Regions:
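Cytosolic juxtamembrane helix and N-cap/initiation of the first transmembrane helix
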Residues: 1-32
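Membrane-interfacial loop-to-transmembrane-helix junctions in polytopic alpha-helical membrane proteins
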Residues: 11-21, 45-48, 71-82, 108-115
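Generic alpha-helical transmembrane segments
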Residues: 48-67
Length: 150
């Protein structure tokens, strides 16, 4: 199986039902924010693509995170907790961007307002915990615990 095939949303071999539901939930949320941000650019008062781009990046991480550590034999609960932290931070980032969009009524406020700072912080935390998961999976792959196709 190629790297592209393993990252498709439909490839859910070895995942639990909860992981599948979470993947589809975050995928639907990602599509919704993309459509809303593009629609808001054409029909809104202000261009919010920067803000929604941040939320979309965090959601893109969250789409592939559920079940990420399941393929690692003997994975600790800490890795599963890292998955949940990434998912929670992406939700916080998305919520902060939406709150910032609603509270300024479509008019761009100062560049670094509170919702933007919260969204950036949550996105940074999500990225850091994703890197922890990525390193754990690569270390397991180098030890020979995970086949290269996963």
């Amino acid at each position: 199986m190629s790297t592209i095939e393993q990252n498709l949303i439909g490839n859910t071999a070895g995942l639990s039902r909860v992981d599948k539901v979470l993947r589809y939930f975050f995928f639907a949320l990602l599509i919704g924010t993309i459509v809303y941000s593009i629609g808001g650019t054409f029909f809104g008062r202000d261009n919010r693509l920067n803000d929604y781009g941040l939320a979309d990046a965090a959601l893109l991480l969250a789409v592939f995170i559920p079940g990420y550590s399941r393929h690692i034999p003997g994975a600790h609960r800490a890795l599963r907790a890292c998955e949940w932290v990434v998912m929670a931070c992406s939700l916080v980032s998305t919520a902060a961007v939406i709150v910032g969009d609603v509270t300024d009524h479509g008019v761009r406020p100062e560049p670094y307002n509170m919702p933007w700072n919260v969204a950036m912080g949550a996105g940074l935390v999500a990225f850091c915990f994703f890197v922890v998961l990525l390193i754990a999976k690569e270390r397991a792959r180098r030890r020979g615990l995970v086949p290269p196709a996963r």
